[in-house]
Amino acid sequence: MVRSTLTLLALFNVAILFPGKAMSQNSEGREFNGKYQKEYLDKIAFPIGGIGAGMFCLEGTGAISHVSLRHHPDVMNEPYTFAAIYVKGVENGAKVLEGQVPTWKLFGPAQSGLGRGDKTYGLPRFEEAVFQARFPFATVDLKDKDMPLAAKITGWSPFIPTDADNSSLPVGVLEYQFTNTSGKAIAVSYTYLTLPTN
């Protein structure tokens, strides 16, 4: 018993001293603290907003959820709000700036048993999304074979270590960046939609 405890302590100390080797991969092979893609995007919700000032979350796919304002935490709140892009002259050139909707959302949204879909899941979205978090920043990179551009969403909060006043400002930022990957000029229209709720 004592010997196995000492061995565990020694292994723990090695992991602390050499985190790059001891903690670089988990049992499924995803890199520790690396990028999230495919099924690893399904349950990510990165909080954005000032400390104690309400929040919304940037999901792994780029969707907005968990909108909690005015001291009312509401982690199931998914408003009718999304960014979209249209590329002129491209077939299938209009898409929501999000990755594919996770399967668990399609078959289990809140109150779906009451016949309330209240979702925008049927709109076309980008095929691939890659999420990476480096607090207080999170990025979602979007790609699609139909689109002659790549999109990047960067979400961040006003977090300044040792500065509680400025870190608690009621601010959350989403930046959208587009890169033309076609090699020729394209005409693009971007919009951010907020639709009324029922």
Model-derived segments and spans:
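Positively charged n-region of N-terminal signal peptides that target proteins for export
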Residues: 1-4
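Boundary at the C-terminal end of the N-terminal hydrophobic targeting segment
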Residues: 19-24
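Beta-strand-rich N-terminal accessory domains
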Residues: 25-106
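Extended, loop-rich substrate-binding clefts of extracytoplasmic carbohydrate-active enzymes
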Residues: 106-171
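Asparagine-centered strand-capping/turn motif at beta-strand->loop junctions
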Residues: 177-182
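Short, hydrophobic/aromatic beta-strand segments
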Residues: 186-190
